[in-house]
Amino acid sequence: MNPRKKVDLKLIIVGAIGVGKTSLLHQYVHKTFYEEYQTTLGASILSKIIILGDTTLKLQIWDTGGQERFRSMVSTFYKGSDGCILAFDVTDLESFEALDIWRGDVLAKIVPMEQSYPMVLLGNKIDLADRKVPQEVAQGWCREKDIPYFEVSAKNDINVVQAFEMLASRALSRYQSILENHLTESIKLSPDQSRSRCC
């Protein structure tokens, strides 16, 4: 029996202030929900180990602050990430309207810039009654960008695990693809090496 492969992945969670990024992360990692709101300044990091197929994944998940004044500082944390959760609050239209900016910030920091960079969108706080962003509108935004969409509740633990593990799965696939391409490139012979030489 083959031992499990071990892979470390860096994931980030971004979005406007107050959308519940920290609550989503704590629900996923610790199965807890805190009623009191505290603003994340800069970034905090939580880790979780999961098993996907024959691979043990160590997820290092960076929870980034959503305050406008810290955006340039926070965006430095995006570098080297393997995937991103974009989050908005379904009761806050402005948080949804800001998604293009957040997505653009993330993609601008990814090296190399790739269309295949994995993202998922989470519409949080579906447990609240005063919804402002219709599900169809969020789904339409995601269809345009080919991003999976999850309606979630950090408070009631609805779809949180599914969303994070969808991102982890996509990030792992991308990681494996990059690794395979790198190995293929390193095996190819250069033109000089491919010609047989006589002494």
UniProtKB/Swiss-Prot annotation:
NCBIfam families in the record: small_GTP
InterPro entries: P-loop_NTPase (IPR027417), Small_GTP-bd (IPR005225), Small_GTPase (IPR001806)
Topological relation to the membrane, as annotated: Lipid-anchor
Record-listed GTP binding positions: 15-22, 34-40, 63-67, 124-127, 154-155
Keywords, ordered alphabetically: Cytoplasmic vesicle, Endosome, Golgi apparatus, GTP-binding, Lipoprotein, Lysosome, Membrane, Nucleotide-binding, Phosphoprotein, Prenylation, Protein transport, Transport
Record function comment: Controls vesicular trafficking from endosomes to the trans-Golgi network (TGN). Acts as a negative regulator of TLR9 signaling and can suppress TLR9-triggered TNFA, IL6, and IFNB production in macrophages by promoting TLR9 lysosomal degradation. Also negatively regulates TLR4 signaling in macrophages by promoting lysosomal degradation of TLR4. Promotes megakaryocytic differentiation by increasing NF-kappa-B-dependent IL6 production and subsequently enhancing the association of STAT3 with GATA1. Not involved in the regulation of the EGF- and EGFR degradation pathway.
The UniProt record lists the keyword Transport: yes
Lipidation (S-geranylgeranyl cysteine): C198, C199
GO MF assignments: GTP binding; GTPase activity
Motif annotated as Switch 1, chain positions: 28-41
Tissue-by-tissue expression: Expressed in heart, placenta, lung, skeletal muscle and peripheral blood leukocyte.
Single Gene Ontology BP annotation: endosome to lysosome transport
Family, similarity comment: Belongs to the small GTPase superfamily. Rab family.
Protein name: Ras-related protein Rab-7b
GO CC terms in record: Golgi apparatus; late endosome; late endosome membrane; lysosome; phagocytic vesicle; phagocytic vesicle membrane; trans-Golgi network
Free-text comment about domains: Switch 1, switch 2 and the interswitch regions are characteristic of Rab GTPases and mediate the interactions with Rab downstream effectors. The switch regions undergo conformational changes upon nucleotide binding which drive interaction with specific sets of effector proteins, with most effectors only binding to GTP-bound Rab.
A Pfam family hit: Ras
Subcellular location: Late endosome; Lysosome; Golgi apparatus; Golgi apparatus, trans-Golgi network
Residues carrying Phosphoserine: S186
